[in-house]
Amino acid sequence: MAVLGPKATLAAVFIGPFIVACMLGIGLVYLLQLQVQIFHVKDTIRVTGKPATVSYTISTPVTPSATTLDGTTYTLIRPTSSYTRVYLGKTRGFDTSTFGPKVLDYITSSKPHLNSGRPYSLSC
């Protein structure tokens, strides 16, 4: 067996165990990451759902109105007598259905300008 010099002995004693320790450390880090992925620990940090907003109103909004070309203003009245508490904004009004878009039918509060005997019927 050959006799190792002092430099070779230093390398064999310190560098070899250092390489083994580095390999063990890398292996432990890999196993820790694998365990985190298996138990979905990272999912508790991320936001996975899309945020949504629902607007509610406590009081009845301002009654919509229609103005003709000659400047006459008519108040639009919903033909139904009951409202839900959910108000979906100016374009959709009250939503009385459980799902889907709602088409609102309005009638005017007074007879039309030409006095035909029937109020205007508007659909939004």
Swiss-Prot record:
Pfam families: Corona_NS4. Keywords: Host membrane, Membrane, Transmembrane, Transmembrane helix. Its main location: host cell. Belongs to the coronaviruses ns4/ns4.8 protein family. One of its GO terms (cellular component) is host cell membrane. It is a single-pass membrane protein. It comes from the Viruses. This is Non-structural protein 4. It is found in: Host membrane. InterPro entries: Corona_NS4 (IPR005603). The chain crosses the membrane at residues 12-32. Signal peptide: none annotated.
